[in-house]
Each structure stands twice: as C-alpha cells, then as structure tokens.
Amino acid sequence: MVAYLNIHTAYDLLNSSLKIEDAVRLAVSENVDALAITDTNVLYGFPKFYDTCIANNIKPIFGMTIYVTNGLNNIETVVLAKDNYGLKDLYQLSSEIKMNALEHVSFELLKRFSNNMIIIFKNVADEHRDIVRVFDSHEDTYLDHRSVLVQGIKHVWIQDVCYQTRHDADTISALAAIRDNTKLDLIHDQEDFGAHFLTENEIHQLDVNPEYFTQADRIAQKCNAELKYHQSLLPQYQTPNDESAKKYLWRVLVTQLKKLELNYDVYLERLKYEYKVITNMGFEDYFLIVSDLIHYAKTNDVMVGPGRGSSAGSLVSYLLGITTIDPIKFNLLFERFLNPERVTMPDIDIDFEDTRREKVIQYVQEKYGELHVSGIVTFGHLLARAVARDVGRIMGFDEVTLNEISSLIPHKLGITLDEAYQIDDFKKFVHRNHRHERWFSICKKLEGLPRHTSTHAAGIIINDHPLYEYAPLTKGDTGLLTQWTMTEAERIGLLKIDFLGLRNLSIIHQILTQVKKDLGINIDIEKIPFDDQKVFELLSQGDTTGIFQLESDGVRSVLKKLKPEHFEDIVAVTSLYRPGPMEEIPTYITRRHDPSKVQYLHPHLEPILKNTYGVIIYQEQIMQIASTFANFSYGEADILRRAMSKKNRAVLESERQHFIEGTKQNGYHEDISKQIFDLILKFADYGFPRAHAVSYSKIAYIMSFLKVHYPNYFYANILSNVIGSEKKTAQMIEEAKKQGITILPPNINESHWFYKPSQEGIYLSIGTIKGVGYQSVKVIVEERYQNGKFKDFFDFARRIPKRVKTRKLLEALILVGAFDAFGKTRSTLLQAIDQVLDGDLNIEQDGFLFDILTPKQMYEDKEELPDALISQYEKEYLGFYVSQHPVDKKFVAKQYLTIFKLSNAQNNKPILVQFDKVKQIRTKNGQNMAFVTLNDGIETLDGVIFPNQFKKYEELLSHNDLFIVSGKFDLRKQQRQLIINEIQTLATFEEQKLAFAKQIIIRNKSQIDMFEEMIKATKENANDVVLSFYDETIKQMTTLGYINQKDSMFNNFIQSFNPSDIRLI
C-alpha cells in the first residue's frame, strides 16, 4: 500500500481535525505502512506522532508544510527529513519561521536547510517554474502528481489529509470559522475538499500514473529519522579555573558544612552518601546550575522559598542554599528525592516571589544565551464547554441560546459531551430541532482538538547549546518556547527547571522591606524563633486570614480544635487537610490531646509514628516502615511506595511478596507482616511528601509570625494583593478593624498605589478609588516626592497638571476623604472644585504667579455631609466602607439581640440590613415580587422576595429603615443570594426579643452584683428567663439563676452590659 506523505494533524491548529491517533488507526485499517506528519510551519505533534506510529508498527516520517517564495509567487511545499541530520534541519527551519513570524520561506532559507531533506513542490504551475529550477541540483526534489511537468524532476503521488472521511469535511469549515471569527455556511451542502484519508478502494479508482505511487514508497524508504529519548543533554557548569564539576561541588559542600554549627560526623556521613549518588548519576552539574541561579536571586534582592517538593530532603540542596530546610533535623529522606535504584532526572522546583521571578529568568538568559533558554508550550483544547460555545457562535446562535448551552453543561473538570448528553435537559436541547442536532454533530467531531498555544506557567528549559539542535522553538508572549510540551522536552533529555512565582513570598519580602525602612528592624526570617507562643495562640484561634496554606474555613476549624503547640502540628495540618487523609483528622486531634489513646500495631512503629500520634501522614513514614520491617533500602522502599500509589495489581502482588519475605527474614511473624503491609497500603494513596509539607509550613509560620508581631504591615500588604476584589478587600478591612487596627482613608500626602502601613494604622490605597487610574496616581506620587507634601487642596490643584486634574478625579479623592487631613469638610471641598477648574486660577505650575493672583481665602465653608451619605460615597468609590456604616454602627450596639452579618449567617437566622435597592417586577401570573440588594454595612448581597412574602411586607419596603431579615440561602447563576421569608423593622425585632427571650447568656460577671436582688435561684413563673454565664477560658456554660422579664429593672440589666458581652436567645 502506498505511503501517505502529507498528513496534517490537529496540531496544525484550526486547520485540521485529524487527531494523530485517528490518522494512525486509519493507516492500520487501510494497510498503509508509512505516514508523514506535515503540519504547516510547526512540529508540535512530532513526539506524539512518533510514539503512536511506533506502537502500531507504522513507519513515522517527519516533515512540515511550508510556503516557498521568490518574492513574486508562493508555492506550497512539503519537506521531509531523510535522517536525523534532516530532522535537526527541520527543527531549525521551523524555529526560524516561528521565531521570526514568517508567512513565507525564501528559497535561499530553504536551500540552507535542504541537504538532508526531501522537497516536494505542490500544485506547480508555469509561474512557479523559476522557484523549482533553483532546486535542480538538489537530488531529492519532486513535484506532486497535480503539478505541471518540469524537465528532470520526478512526480510523486501525495494526498493532502486534514480530516478522517469525506463526511467530516464540515469540520474544516467549522475550524476556519472559529479561527477567522466568521459564521458557518449551513445553507449549502458542505463541499468535500478531497482532503480525507482515502480507502484502498478510493485509491484504486484514482486516475494517477502508477509510477507516482511507487515514487511515494521510494521516498518513504529514504526517510529514516528517529526521535532519540533520554539523551544526556545536561548543560555543563562553568567552574572557577576549569576545575571538574565533581571536585568543585565537593569542595563547596565541605566548606559550607564546616561553617554550620552541626554534628559534623553525622552530617558528613549523610553528605558522602548523597554526593556519591549524585555524582554516580552524573548530576553534579545540575546541582551547581540550580545553586548558581538561586545564589543570584538571593544576592539580588529576590526572595526564594525555603524549598518545594521532595528536594528539601537533600542535605546537598541544603548546603548549596537551594533549600533552607535541614533534612536531618526534620527527618527527611534523600531517596524520596533522588532514588539510586530508579534513575530519573532530579526535579528541583523553585519558588520565587512572583513580582521578581522574571529577573531570575533574565539572568539565566544572559548567562546561557537567548537561544539556550526557553519556556515551554502548552495547548488549550476545545473541551466540552468551549467547543459547545464556539460552534454555537459560528452557527449564529443568539446569546440567550449560548447561555442556555453553558448552563446545561455542568462545571465539572474534564466533562465530555457524551457525559453531558446523559443529562435529560441537555439531550432535549440537542434534539430540539435539526439545527441543534447538526451543532452537536460538529461539536463531537471537534471536541478535544488543540485550539491554541500558551506558555507553561513555570517551566524553563536550559542548555549550553542552541535549543533548536534538540527541539523546535516558537515565539511566546514573553520569549522563546519549545514547540514540545514539558513532558516531551524532558523525555528528550532537556533540563527543565520550574521557576514558580509565589505571591506569599512577595508579601513577606515587602513586609520585611517596609519594617526595615520604617522601624529600623532587620528581620532575618532564618533566625526567628519557631517556638513563639504568640504564633501558636494566633493559630489556635483560627486567626489565619491571609496566611499561606492555612486560611480556608476548613483549616481554621481544624486549627481551633487542634490548638497547635509546635511547628510539627502545622506540618501535620497542611498534610492532613486534603481529600483522603481528612478522615484521619479527628483521630489525630483526639490522640494529640490525649496521647494515651495512641495504639501501635507493633512496638517498632512507635519511633516512626510517634510525632504523628500513630497516624501515617507522610510518604517518608511509609518508606521508613518498609525499611524497618522488611529491611528495604530507602530506594527499594520508594519503589514500593510508588507501586502502592499506582494500584497496579500485578506489581502490588509482587511487592507484597517481596515485603513479606523481607519481614520474615528480618524476624517478624507473617501475620504481623501482612497487617503492616495492609496498613501502609491504606495510607500510600494519599500520604503526603513530608519534605514539601515542612517547606510550605515554614512559609506559613513566617507569615503567622509577621502577622502577630507586625500586624499593620501584614494587613497592608495582604490588602495590596487583593486590590480589585471588593469582597476580599471588605472582608480583610473588617478583620483588620477587629484586630484593633485603624483603617485610615486615602491620604493625598501619605497614600500610594498600594496600601501603606504606619504606626497609626493603614492608609488606604489611592489605587482602590474608582475613577483614579494608575497613571494619575503615578503623577500625584511623583509630584509629592519631587516637591514635597501638598499644603492644602489648592496647592494640590496648582501642582497637578491639567491632563490629570479632572472633575471626576477631584470628586473621587474628596468623597473618599483623601483631603480630610487639611481640616476642611468634604462638602466644602466639593464646593471648591469649580474654583480650581476655572481658567484664571489654572496658572500652570507657576507658584509665584499663583500666589499673586489667587485670593488667600477661597473656601466657602459648608457643614459636613451626613454620615449615611459619606458611607454611601465611600462604598460607591471604594467598594467598601471606611467610616463606620450606619448599619454596622447599629449592629455593634444591637448585637446582644443575637443577630448576624451576611457573611456568617445561616438559613433562617436574623440578619441586620438596609435595602440599598428594591426592584419590583410582575410575574407571568400577574403577581408582584421584588429583587433587592441587602447591605449589612460590610458587604452587599442580592435577595429575592417572592409574591406571597412581597404581599405581606410590601408596605415595609417603602420605608427607609433598618430591617431584620431571615430566609434561605441558595445560588443563582453561581452567585449566593437570600430568598427572604421574613422582614421586621429593627425596633419591632428588638421589642419582641426583649419580651420573649428564653435565655440570657453573659460572658462578663462584673455587673451581676448590682442586680443581685433580681436574680432568683429557681424558676417561679412563665416570665422567668434563665441567666447563664459562659466562661471562655474553659469553654463551659453555667446557670446563674433566673430573671423576670416583667421586672421594671429588666431593660436596665440588659443595657448595663457591653453589647458584645451579652446575648438574648
């Protein structure tokens, strides 16, 4: 059967719908022996194509389609690699095209790379002869079977394949419409482009010279390039004085070990072992390269994380400064990182502060050269939800229908159209009419195809040779990328290092910088005490908002129950709070508070599991158990752990026998051996790498330390990192206020784009003000730095240029209080805007003329705006309230009524709100209902009042008052809302609460003596309410007696308490 020399796969993005696996499947079914991948200008699909062909006994041929030009005419051309030299030429040619965004390839460029290639010109017409003649002397130049005759050049049959069968031609039209953002023509019958995979029968019916088919086979036989995997492509580290990398590495390690105050003999023994493993595997250059770039970061003001993943288990990494985790102190295993019995590339991922990560990448590019460093390509795919909308759009579906499609496909990771089709509503939509069925048919054909490229978030490839020698390159948004994915590039043998940006490191660095600048305190995070009781008190209270790894509601709950006392408790929590091990959290907490409940299957488990109270949490513990009981080396134990996590039945059974045999030889009874194996098998699936847990727990602890000791700086930087999120900002500001931190309005003489900490509190960011853009803030801050603080509002107006000084800007700054420090009311400053915008006062930047021509008294003093209006403007311009909102102020005074905020209310609990908006609508049945916006002084929430409730409370809604509402929370369009069942004025609710309270709970007994005569030991009548005291120190409630609600002193008793110290239930 003839070879196919012109296959366009789906990696010819939006030009082909032919998946590689389908092309190979068709080749097998049609007895095709060889396939050539020839995507246009790119080599994205090479590794997958090669692997799939080899697995199915199809000969893979590597090629590419290009368009060759002489400046006047262009000709479609297929180039194929004859051997591995040709393969490298393809890499470089594709790289040239993609790096320089070439649409056409000059014949000079093609000639540069053609020596080891076969060239096939397609559809050659008379006007193309001049281009073809340039390649007369090239022994492997051909014309396709449709081309005109050119003397001396042979013809070959070549079938352009872009889709599976003639019935799939519509996929090409659909992809073109998606690519070009046009509509799909559904009126006319779909044209068959003749670019499908021909069957044997269809080929026999072709009117083509049989010699052309034979020529295709000959060409296929000439093409023998192969992809080489697992090459040794590590770059060499340039050592001082050309010393060998092995010797240099050892000298550096021993020197560093001597500097540290450690048990030298113990650490030296571990170091010798690790060094031997690393050098035997040939990875000494790798460690020196990573150490070098981390050293650069740390000496150039770029914060680096303490470690990530299993690399923190290496003493070599610790001594080189790659990590800051002592693996011996924390009982970490080197073999979990680098296993001498399973040779794989070491994988050190590095966390840098996210705002300076690019600085380190730039250093690597400068050190190794631009063509020696690249990012890695990733592909976005036409997954179910995306393809459904894309195809709907090109078929002309209106927005309502597109939204309906989106709502019918569940938000489930990896969901397929077949899965969605099992849902009745989706199935009904598909079969609503023929158009929808056609839509679904096209969607199914396109589902899963790669749609576009993007850049891998972290991976960087480094080599001391130009990368195009080993893999093709392309141009990304921020630099070069390999055309192959991370897994494919690593499999070739290229060095990949993940440069990850971690926001929390930026926050820590910023806090340290500001504390040093403002307070003169130089905090060395490597020397802070890791047994600070204030830190553990913070964690025990669950006060972990903004703290890395510990801020979710679930983790807070665990921390409150656990009451951490040691750093190890943090390590355990971060490891346990994940799907799977979460079920062990209650056991861990119970045993942590009562160690007597810890039981071990065998006494020899105690040294391994003592720190985790008998619970297996870490992967390293599984390895230690295998070593202790079965006498496994840690390398063997790591292989066992991996086998267990993969659940391969055959491998597992083999490892079970290996383990039991090892335990028997080690003197353990077979019954206990089986029990131990089953125990570690249970936990192997979700055991967490302890090295990673320790590293990330260290970041969590550092942030907790900074939050405890420098709260103003902590909250200011957390707030700066949530600029743009009104909800998160409001929540963080509310928490900061609860911690006693004063939130200051934006100050024109103090504030910046970010939040600014100070001794007095935190100045809000000017950048949070709606209508004030970054450039305006930049101008204001630069003017302040260059010429000093602004003296007053008019000085500000004089010094800021006209292009920035708009009415919109001035109003926004005034209404959020940016000029409050000048001692004038906001209403006075609003009145003054017209004056500063008048032309005769706008004497550009000339202070002398301004002082002469401007009257000294220009303010027309006005009374301050009402509190409610100030709050309204703050909410409008900032998205939250700086001054205390009237509702929030009333909440503080009335919290004794046991009322709730929107953020912590549950179904049917009373919530104090005002109605910001009431939108009345009429239902299809002619009944009135309303959509409302609820405001609790901190945040807003949508609510709905259905007809029955609306009829009941319609009159109340017309009042501008504070209300107590209750109802049921649910989701509408993925947004939380409250279905309101009951509405009362605050006054009515308070009156009823005082009259019908069933219990009074106090947490401060200092007022009790004044009302001793009111408190009775027993309940004497129906009006007596139980009085209880809640002791927070021991978390215990005790009954003090009873108080009569009808007593004339009842209200006085209630009001004598601080509202936060009493609750009516």
Swiss-Prot record:
Coiled-coil positions: none
Principal cellular location given in the protein's record: cytoplasm
EC number(s) stated in the UniProt entry for this protein: 2.7.7.7
Known catalytic reactions: DNA(n) + a 2'-deoxyribonucleoside 5'-triphosphate = DNA(n+1) + diphosphate
Gene Ontology, cellular component aspect: cytoplasm
InterPro entries for the chain: DNA_pol3_alpha_NTPase_dom (IPR011708), DNA_pol3_alpha_thumb_dom (IPR041931), DNA_pol3_finger (IPR040982), DnaE2/DnaE/PolC (IPR004805), DNAPol_HHH (IPR029460), NA-bd_OB_tRNA (IPR004365), PHP_dom (IPR004013), Pol/His_phosphatase_N (IPR003141)
Protein name as it appears in the record: DNA polymerase III subunit alpha
